[in-house]
Amino acid sequence: MHPILKNIRSQPDQGRAEEHNPELHCGIAGTGGLEEQLRSKQREDRFHKACPPAVDLNRDDTQLYGEGERDLRLKSSACVQLDRTPVTPEDFVPDDMGSRAIRQMEAAKLVRNGQHTRDVERWQHDTYCSHLTQLLVRPLTSLGVMYLADFLNTFVELPPNHTLTMQLVTIINHTSEPTLRRLLKDIGEKDAEGHLKNEWLLQLLSIIEMIFKDEPSERARLTALLTVTNEVALNFSKKASGGNYPTTDRLSKTLTYFRRMIVALLALAESLGCYTNNYCARKPEKRCRTQVEPSDESYMFSLKGALEAPESDEEEEEWIRD
């Protein structure tokens, strides 16, 4: 790794802010940033105070589950038929399996948590589609994707270069996603066999570049990105599960991870594409709004020059118009 990349540090106040305001779910199980937390709080405000908080079965970290238990709970919650009859005191009489009232409350809790988990997955999908749509309609995202893919492929193919390293540092400083920032920092690292450790990121970026080249409309690009996200998440979740078909919670966590990566790549590409445009106003501002008044010494020097060598009438008229 280049010495410059080793010295890159995150913002000094970022660690202190996370200590005071920790994220609800960190790492690969993260469900989003401040927006997701605010939406979660708004949904909780609609619940009655007597109701216990709903649990996301895919990301519940309050207790340990057995292997495949999360998937079994989620699937069984959609098949349970609740008994809507009121509970009587006789239902609390204990039997061999506890009591009928306890079993009824456990079933209601399972159905409620399962429905909440499916709602969370639906909300995440809608949020992901909204973020992709906002990034796809921006005119400079496509150019940023082309530049980012070409630069990263050039960086890993050529030998270590100080100029390319400084350019990579500039790109890293524009990255707001911590995971993508770490991956870009180690983009040129290789394993013992000489293979790139983060080659999957280059392949994912190449697929996104291909989508921008082949698909002409934003709707077609959105559909292609959604399909690629599902296929990549399914492929790597099967690989992480030892070749077996992944459970629902593992597939959901992997899908969330790649959603965050794709959104972060498109946001980085859009910020890089902005460098090509030098925005200027159609009607330039008056000089008094863009320049401060000169000092007395500067004005007296200009006055002395005007007295010693007066300009022509055309230059005087131009100065008056300015």
UniProtKB/Swiss-Prot annotation:
List the residue ranges of the region (Interaction with packaging protein 1). 1-127
- Please list where the region (Disordered) is annotated: 1-24
Chief place of localization? host cell
Tell what triggers its expression. Answer: Expressed in the early phase and late phase of the viral replicative cycle.
Please describe the post-translational modifications of this protein.
Answer: Cleaved at different sites by the viral protease during virion maturation.
Question: A single GO BP annotation from the record?
Answer: viral release from host cell
Q: What are the subcellular locations of this protein? A: Host nucleus
Keyword presence, Phosphoprotein: yes
Where does the source fall among the domains of life? Viruses
User: Can you tell me which family this protein belongs to?
Assistant: Belongs to the adenoviridae packaging protein 3 family.
Q: Print the miscellaneous field.
A: All late proteins expressed from the major late promoter are produced by alternative splicing and alternative polyadenylation of the same gene giving rise to non-overlapping ORFs. A leader sequence is present in the N-terminus of all these mRNAs and is recognized by the viral shutoff protein to provide expression although conventional translation via ribosome scanning from the cap has been shut off in the host cell.
Task: Check the record and name the HAMAP family matching this protein.
Answer: ADV_PKG3
Q: Summarize subunit and interaction data from the UniProt record for this chain.
A: Part of the genome packaging complex composed of packaging proteins 1, 2 and 3; this complex specifically binds to the packaging sequence on the left end of viral genomic DNA and performs packaging of the viral genome. Interacts with hexon-linking protein IIIa; this interaction is required to promote correct genome packaging.
Q: Its biological function?
A: Involved in viral genome packaging through its interaction with packaging proteins 1 and 2. After proteolytic cleavage by adenovirus protease, L1 52/55k protein is removed from the capsid during viral maturation.
Q: Provide the protein name.
A: Packaging protein 3
Its lineage reads: Viruses, Varidnaviria, Bamfordvirae, Preplasmiviricota, Tectiliviricetes
What's the name of its gene? L1
